[in-house]
Amino acid sequence: IDVCLTGSQKAIAAPPGISPISVSAKAKKFMIENPPPTHYFNLARYFKYYDEEKHTPFTPALPLLYAYREALSIMLEEGLQNVFNRHKVCSDALYSGLSAIGLTPFAKEEDRSISIVALNYLDGLEDKTFRSTLADKFKVLVAGGFGNLKGKVFRVGCMGEVSPYHVMRTISAISSTLAMMGYDTDAAAGLKTAEEKLKDI
């Protein structure tokens, strides 16, 4: 991998606004020899300042850097393997619990993401109404689908500080919202199924 980048707000759970980037020696050499004519995305300029002064070419967002460092410290304190395990177990619990209340995951089991749980909408369930009811009544936010999946799926984030509390609360809120909208769901089955999975944390 020559270039790898992410967002600070993803599984690291820091505020958004920082994009950590890792660049191989080969990619760095290429970028220095072929700098872009723009100010933005000009990593060659960043390399020069960092290599010579350990500084950035422009004013850095220091509060975000402090928050990012603290988020990394929290991860290291928990232990990376524990962080990975917590994400995996919570994801499994969400998939299993939401399936038990009558929803179906969008992807086949072998293709599913751990960090984003995508589920198909039940027949007749309107995307905006469902998501706004879930947010207004239970303060649980989920995202809709993109492109040809818009209105067909919704996505539940399972990353960062996700915990058994978040899993159980999300399953309960989704089940209650579906019931409010006239769908027959089995919240107790969903919560019991998820609780069994969460014993692995």
Segments predicted by a language model, with ranges:
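Short beta-strand-to-loop capping motifs
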Residues: 23, 119-123, 160
